[in-house]
Amino acid sequence: MQEFISMATEFAQKHTLLAVSWFAIFVMVIYTFYKGATSKFKVITHNEVIRLINSDEAIVVDLRSLEEFQRGHIINSINVLPSEIKNQNIGKLESHKENALILVDTNGTSASASAVFLTKQGFNSVFVLKEGLSAWVAANLPLVKKHK
């Protein structure tokens, strides 16, 4: 064991940038697993979204702008902006506190922040569509268009 430590130390001294890079990647992987394990919401695939909608009466919350929402959204979605959730202006969602909420954004990058706010406001069953509506469209799943 001591030989391994001396070899690792020697390697780190000779290849500092590489050693620091590997350490940073290791820390990021650990952080990602920790964050996922302690998160109060779950990131799910489009197949799981379909199952939740069909079996658990889940509510789909579309976080995109009204214009994007009108161009196409998952059937029966409710359009709520992330700023409304952040400012606790969630009247549209209050009656659905006991339902599973599925948050959908464009590509899955911003819905997590809204999920954190909703779990803090007492919503117990919050999910985020992995890769957002782009994954839904890529899987050739249907969208509803709403005209002005």
UniProtKB/Swiss-Prot annotation:
SUPFAM superfamilies in alphabetical order: Rhodanese/Cell cycle control phosphatase
Domain Rhodanese: 54-148
CDD domains membership: RHOD (cd00158)
Signal sequence coordinates: none
Domain of life: Bacteria
Family matches, as PANTHER family: FAD-DEPENDENT OXIDOREDUCTASE, RHODANESE-RELATED SULFURTRANSFERASES
Name the UniProt record assigns to this protein: Uncharacterized protein HI_0744
Upper taxonomic lineage: Bacteria, Pseudomonadati, Pseudomonadota, Gammaproteobacteria, Pasteurellales
